[in-house]
Amino acid sequence: MPHYILKKSFYEQSSLTVAGKLLGKKLLFNQHQGIITETEAYIGQDDPAAHSARGYTKRTSVMFGSPGFSYVYFIYGMYYCLNVVTEQEGFPAAVLIRGIVLLSENKPNTIINGPGKLCKILQITKEHNNTDITQKYNFCICNTDINIDNYICTPRIGISKGKEKFWRFVIPDLTFLLNV
């Protein structure tokens, strides 16, 4: 199967569908690449853990925008987090990329767990917010030959509200990815 950049139509699906289907896909950012191993969905204004729960603001405007765009924000005064906008324009939803297996030459097969670590190592910052990742080859997510059948859903991590939702998607055994 050729590896192609995921198109806007991929991100127009429900956030829960996208969060599961992103597992095993390849995140490309400048000279870095990694296989996505963990995601979390944040859906609409009724999701108390979503930034969009407080409505439309300058910060959340990207979440209300076109699917397939990056939503990068700063937390705890020290970390950036990378999300991809999902569903339909006007409905605020995004999927947080929480972990990857790094495939870059200088750190091959390194497990990066945590969205802050991911952005720090890949050097993703606020300047990469609101980028169309369906068009740029140096910042995109591509299809792979990896088929992820066995993932688990758990409660989301690091939130104080909406903990009852099992909207975190994770590959429990990364052993097979360490030889990709």
Swiss-Prot record:
Record-linked Gene3D superfamilies: Methylpurine-DNA glycosylase (MPG)
Tagged with keyword Cell inner membrane: no
Source domain of life: Bacteria
Natural source organism: Ehrlichia chaffeensis (strain ATCC CRL-10679 / Arkansas)
PANTHER family linked: DNA-3-METHYLADENINE GLYCOSYLASE
Record bears the keyword Transmembrane: no
Keyword annotations of the record: DNA damage, DNA repair, Hydrolase
Protein name: Putative 3-methyladenine DNA glycosylase
InterPro entries: Formyl_transferase-like_C_sf, MPG, MPG_sf
Pfam families: Pur_DNA_glyco
